[in-house]
From Swiss-Prot:
The gene is htpG. NCBIfam families: PRK05218.1. Its main location: cytoplasm. Belongs to the heat shock protein 90 family. GO terms for molecular function: ATP binding; ATP hydrolysis activity; ATP-dependent protein folding chaperone; unfolded protein binding. Residues 346-562 are annotated as: B. InterPro entries: HATPase_C_sf (IPR036890), Heat_shock_protein_90_CS (IPR019805), HSP90_C (IPR037196), Hsp90_fam (IPR001404), Hsp90_N (IPR020575), Ribosomal_Su5_D2-typ_SF (IPR020568). It comes from Shewanella amazonensis (strain ATCC BAA-1098 / SB2B). Pfam families: HATPase_c_3, HSP90. This is Chaperone protein HtpG. CDD domains: HATPase_Hsp90-like (cd16927). Residues 1-345 are annotated as: A. Molecular chaperone. Has ATPase activity.
């Protein structure tokens, strides 16, 4: 006898439903993911309980989920032959938010039995996602092991009340019928549903089936009879999770094809790493390094991150919580048995478990790159050409792994003689001169400007290698990478160029003598240039150039000033230090100049030339041109 009752949802369910529908789920199609996931839960739950009570199968052990659509009626139906629900279970689990029965089921498990149960979904918000697209939802269910007349029908429009009615249901399990809103009728389409199943549920271990219509008998192209076929239910998902298989059972081709499936990339990946971790946290990761950078790698709004699965059920794309920004090029997935999620299952809880997973996966990627660099330099060079600039963000972002990241960096160098960034810091250290204590580098606007900078003259003469940095991010990188393996990184354009043990006592004595002899010249330059410079000094870093400008210790470099100006940031006023090469013929000639006006003009000329050489531009180029023209006029007059 049918027995119908009307119940009110528990406290504030109406408001919670409204919040979830309009705020928590921005992607409407995930209603199917949630309902298929719940259906697979029910099948997995039955499979586990049937291990100790085979009669629960009722003679039907082929577990499956079936999805169908009726365009005329505007409905979508999701049906499973899983554990089903009793009347009390329906009222409890479909009358509350954040509770689906699965969480209660987990509480009844203990010890190793929990490991063996392939169960997911620890809360009940998922079912209510049906109301994102449905104006009315009907649920028909019967619990396994109960009689046919103990079936239950649940119905609601999601407005605060639901009805529960006793019905007769021959088959165990649950059938959910969604009566779609007029504006959501697009989902009452087989092809639309198939694409969603393939996207979200491809790797659920339970087959997710849709009905494939039969075909009548027909004539073939050569007049032969093609027999009729019967309609049948056919699995839309692969029902296998590649990453759950042993690495030895997966071929390279399968790994490559799976990469293309999850990344939508047409090219093979450069490398991958497949790992299963057991212990306090149990998870499997499958991480890929692409061969090519995506076109929008530098788009600030570009989504990145790993695909997140819980027990092989797809939860979300772009789970960026598991990978730092400087590794945003990494593709792949993480599949966790016990990862905590918040109420919506869309946003990961930022807790200790999540942070530990992030740290472990970051180290895994760095290990991949270290191995690639060690085993296949050409392949690593290919990686660097695509993603090196992104990796340079690492030292600023990830202090804990700064040394490892630094070991992966590649630079152009005076040693190689070309612009290809192929030199590692370890390569540099291995070639350091006896007594050399620092790693020397220069940052410039271009490789040519760096390679031809006058600041390199003495170092080139002594055969000391200098790293040539010319990308916009390099100054930012160096500001967060002060040393490597106890070797300080030192800019050849900053402060005094102290070569330490690389200069003998005779050289140092000669330098001191030259500085003393040039003091009157230095004072004349200071007087002529006034507040245009912070200081004037004699230098030995120059051999072929009359003068250069350098940045004082602790001051902002010219490259950093450019970066901040480009970003619209305020920049503190700074004045360069002018360094003079007194052995250069032009400086020696100026030392003898008696006309202080002419001396001042030449001093300004040398300062402008040195500034242009180091910074690539002048604050007032028109004034410089005026000065040049004025001096040219005098020379031809």
């Amino acid at each position: 006898m049918s027995h119908q009752e009307t119940h009110g949802f528990q406290t504030e369910v109406k408001q919670l439903l409204h919040l979830m529908i309009h705020s928590l789920y921005s992607n409407k199609e995930i209603f199917l993911r949630e309902l298929v996931s719940n259906a697979a839960d029910a099948a997995d739950k039955l499979r586990y309980l049937a291990l100790t009570n085979d009669s629960l199968y009722e003679g039907d052990g082929e577990l499956r989920v079936r999805v169908s659509a009726d365009k005329d009626k505007g409905t979508v139906t999701i049906e499973d032959n899983g554990i089903g629900m009793t009347r009390d279970g329906v009222i409890e689990h479909l009358g509350t938010i954040a509770k689906s029965g699965t969480a209660e089921f987990f509480k009844n498990l203990s010890g190793d039995s929990a490991k063996d149960s392939q169960l997911i979904g620890q809360f009940g918000v998922g079912f209510y996602s049906a109301f994102i697209v449905a104006k009315r939802v009907e649920v028909f269910t019967r619990a396994a092991g109960h009689s046919a007349d103990e079936g239950v029908k649940w119905e609601s429009e999601g407005e605060g009340n639901f009805s529960v009615e006793t019905i007769t249901k021959a088959e165990r399990g649950t059938k959910i019928v969604l009566h779609l809103r007029d504006e959501e009728k697009e989902f009452a389409d087989d092809w639309r549903l198939r694409s969603i199943i393939t996207k979200y549920s491809d790797h659920i271990s339970i087959p997710v089936e849709m009905y494939q219509e039969g075909t009548p008998e027909r004539d073939g192209p050569d007049g032969e009879k093609i027999p009729a076929t019967e309609g049948q239910w056919k699995a839309m998902n692969k029902a296998t999770a590649l990453w759950t298989r042993s690495k030895s059972d997966v071929s390279d081709e399968e790994y490559k094809e799976f990469y293309k499936h999850i990344s939508h990339d047409f090219a093979d990946p450069l490398d991958w790493s497949h790992n299963k971790v057991e212990g306090n946290q149990e998870y499997t990761s499958l991480l890929y390094i692409p061969a090519k950078a995506p076109w929008d790698l530098w788009n600030r709004d570009r989504k990145h991150g790993l695909k997140l699965f819980v027990q092989r059920v797809f939860i979300m794309d772009d789970a960026e919580q598991f990978m730092p920004s400087y590794l945003r090029f990494v593709q792949g997935l993480i599949d966790s048995n016990d990862l905590p999620l918040n109420v919506s299952r869309e946003i990961l809880q930022d807790n200790k478990v999540t942070r530990n997973l992030r740290q472990a996966l970051t180290k895994r990627v760095l290990s991949m790159l270290e191995k690639l660099a060690k085993d296949d330099a050409d392949k690593y060079q290919q990686f660097w050409a695509e993603f090196g600039t992104v990796l340079k963000e690492g030292p600023a972002e990830d202090f804990a792994n700064r040394e490892r990241i630094a070991g992966l960096l590649r630079f152009a160098s005076t040693h190689t003689g070309d612009a290809t960034p192929s030199v590692s810091l370890d390569d540099y250290i291995g070639r350091m001169k006896e007594g050399q204590e620092k790693i020397y580098y220069i940052v410039a606007d271009s490789h040519e400007a760096a390679a031809n900078s006058p600041h390199l003259e003495l170092l080139k003469k002594k055969g000391i290698e200098v790293l040539l940095l010319s990308e916009r991010i390099d100054e930012w990188l160096i500001n967060h990478l002060h040393d490597y393996k106890e070797k300080a990184l030192h800019s050849v354009t900053r402060g005094d160029l102290d070569l330490g043990a690389l200069e003998d006592e005779a050289e140092k004595a000669a330098q001191e003598k030259l500085a003393q002899e040039s003091e009157p010249l230095v004072e004349r330059f200071k007087s002529a240039l006034g507040d245009k410079v912070s200081d004037v000094k004699i230098t030995t870093r120059l051999t072929d150039t009359p003068a250069c400008v350098v940045t004082g210790e602790g001051e902002m470099s010219s490259q950093m000033i450019k970066l901040m100006q480009a970003a619209g940031q305020p920049v503190p006023e700074s004045k360069p230090t002018l360094e003079l090469n007194p052995t250069h013929p032009l400086v020696a000639r100026l030392d003898k100049e008696q006309d202080e006006t002419a001396f001042a003009e030449w001093a300004e000329m040398l300062l402008a030339q040195a500034t242009l050489s180091e910074r690539g531009s002048l604050a007032d180029p028109s004034a410089f041109i005026k000065l040049v023209n004025q001096m040219l006029l005098k020379s031809v007059g």
